[in-house]
UniProtKB/Swiss-Prot annotation:
Keywords: ATP-binding, Glutamine amidotransferase, GMP biosynthesis, Ligase, Nucleotide-binding, Purine biosynthesis. The active site is at C84 (nucleophile), H172, E174. The lineage of its organism: Bacteria, Pseudomonadati, Pseudomonadota, Gammaproteobacteria, Thiotrichales. ATP binds at S226, G227, G228, V229, D230, S231, S232. The keyword Transmembrane helix does not apply. It catalyses: XMP + L-glutamine + ATP + H2O = GMP + L-glutamate + AMP + diphosphate + 2 H(+). This is GMP synthase [glutamine-hydrolyzing]. Its EC number is 6.3.5.2. It holds the Pfam family GMP_synt_C. GO terms for molecular function: ATP binding; GMP synthase activity. GO terms for cellular component: cytosol. Residues 8-198 form the Glutamine amidotransferase type-1 domain.
Length: 516
């Protein structure tokens, strides 16, 4: 079997917002990589046995900061690529000079490649459109580096060591705004570092199945199945690896989208023949949420009750030794970062696969090395439906945070119908995949309307659709007026409890994507 981790790249993170993008681009080329903090121990870097090292960008100024690349990076004899801050600290640590730029540079720029024979720019034209994001610049390269690209505002746009395979770029090749950024990454990872492209879905599936079999043996495994992308892909890979040893527990909270519970059972229990236990807990959730209006309280109640019910059912399964979770690589990175984070909590995170402290189960996380886009591709390779894998994100608490204030059965049913109409029309008009997320929100206020000759005094539905790359920021989707009019008319005419539909035109920031 191919060892998909045999050729790998180590990425040292200096705090850039783009660091995860670097990793995704390296993996798109077909090479495994991992992200670690810039101050990771020297012995760890030495023993990691990377074929190459990438130094990320960062928000600090190298001349004001003690944050440097560990010296071991430059002593191992492996190729190094410094990006933005990574380039600046590499040059400075080799005797160069970095100063604050007269003018910060954020946005697209044209660089002129001075040396096309240099491996980092192989198969590229002299002029390249790139994405700059910096306030400092290299003013002196020192005796060890030479300039291999420049721009109007950044005379030192890229450098190469005269004797060693060390390269630096002031711009960000990992962003899609850099026209041939992927080519630069590929040149470094494949041509310069000599990595074989072993990281592909077929090899990942083969590797995961072997690892699961070795780890689990003949033990039984429990999985909390939510119907979301991550838990669905975990169910599929585990079923292929261990078959009947897997039992999925699907807690139907009653806060899912219209008919979603039935769809989950159809895909997994009927189509894939996976052992799924469906727990109808709708009334328990409604009872627990009665009279609760605060969104944080709702999230915590839903999360705790989910774990309690899952715990009750899991205890009934004899000889279970493992609890599977849909943890993905971005969760691992964020969890490591949050241990040192001082950021305020905007919304509590609802992890529907939480590990109850009382349960004596070992943790199984088959997706913990994969980014979300890789998880989706893995799901396709395992035969899961495209529409299940590429549907919009859905919050852990479900419609519980899309119904403002108190949650009532009538409100849930009303929102489910309205939301289903919105989604159906997005698909019909080929708009669903043009937006990143779209949903309805139930507003517990009534508004006067007229249907036919009858006065109607019913509730309001807000429609929300956004476009986003990373969901850290988002713009509201500029959907056609005719389309919005059609959706509004359908909702008001088909959902008797609604008399008015509005469209949310708030970006993030200042708003959040979800209303609660």
């Amino acid at each position: 079997m191919t060892d998909i981790h045999n050729h790998k790249i180590l990425i040292l993170d200096f705090g850039s917002q783009y660091t995860q993008l670097i990793a995704r681009r390296v993996r798109e080329v077909g090479v495994f990589c991992e992200i670690f903090p810039h101050d990771v121990a020297a012995d760890f870097i030495k023993n990691y046995q990377a074929k190459g090292i990438i130094l990320s960008g960062g928000p600090e100024s190298v001349y004001d900061s003690d944050v440097k690349a560990p010296e071991i990076v430059f002593e191992l004899g492996v190729p190094v690529l410094g990006i933005c801050y990574g380039m600046q600290t590499m040059v400075m640590q080799h005797g160069g000079e970095v100063k604050g730029a007269d003018q910060s540079e954020f946005g697209k720029a044209i660089i002129n490649i001075l040396n096309l024979t240099n491996n980092i720019f192989s198969n590229m034209e002299h002029e390249q459109l790139v994405w700059m994001s910096h306030s400092d610049k290299v003013t002196q390269t020192g005796e060890h580096f030479e300039i291999i690209a420049s721009s109007t505002n950044a005379p030192v746009a890229a450098v190469a060591h005269k004797n060693k395979p060390f390269f630096g770029v002031q711009f960000h090749p990992e962003t899609t705004h850099t026209e041939n950024g992927k080519q630069i990454i590929e040149n470094f990872v494949v041509n310069i570092c000599g990595c074989d492209t072993l990281w592909n879905i077929e090899n990942i599936i083969e590797n995961d199945i072997k690892e699961i079999k070795q780890k689990v043996g003949t033990d039984k495994v429990i999985l909390g199945l939510s119907g979301g992308v991550d838990s669905s892909v975990v169910a599929a890979i585990l079923h292929q690896a261990i078959g009947d040893q897997l039992t999925c527990i699907f807690v139907d909270t009653g806060l899912l989208r219209l008919n979603e519970g039935d769809q989950v059972m159809q895909v997994f229990a009927e189509h894939m023949d996976i052992n799924v236990i469906r727990i109808n807990a709708k009334n328990r959730f409604l009872d627990a949420l009665r009279g609760i209006c605060d969104p944080e309280q709702k999230r915590k109640i839903i999360g705790k009750l989910f774990v309690d019910i899952f715990d009750e059912e899991a205890a009934k399964i004899e000889n279970a030794k493992w609890l599977a979770q849909g943890t993905i690589y971005s969760d691992v990175i964020e969890s490591a970062g949050n241990n040192q984070s001082k950021a305020h909590v905007i919304k509590s995170h609802h992890n529907v696969g939480g590990l109850p402290k009382e349960m004596k189960l070992k943790l199984l996380e088959p997706l913990r090395e994969l980014f979300k886009d890789e998880v989706r591709k893995l799901g396709l390779g395992l035969g899961l439906p495209y529409n299940m894998l590429y549907r919009h994100p859905f919050p852990g608490p479900g419609l519980g945070v899309r119904i403002l204030g108190e949650i009532k059965k009538e409100y849930v049913e009303t929102l489910q119908k309205a939301d289903a109409i919105f989604t159906e029309e997005l698909y019909k008009h080929n708009l669903y995949h043009d937006v990143s997320q779209a949903f309805g929100v139930f507003l517990p206020i009534k508004s006067v309307g007229v249907v036919g000759d009858q006065r109607r005094y019913e509730y309001v539905i807000a429609l929300r659709a956004v476009v986003s790359i990373d969901f850290m920021t988002a713009t509201w989707a500029n959907l056609p007026y005719d389309f919005l009019s059609l959706v509004s008319n359908r909702i008001v005419n088909e959902v008797k409890q609604v008399s008015r539909v509005v469209y949310d035109v708030t970006g993030k920031p200042p708003g959040t994507i979800e209303w609660e």
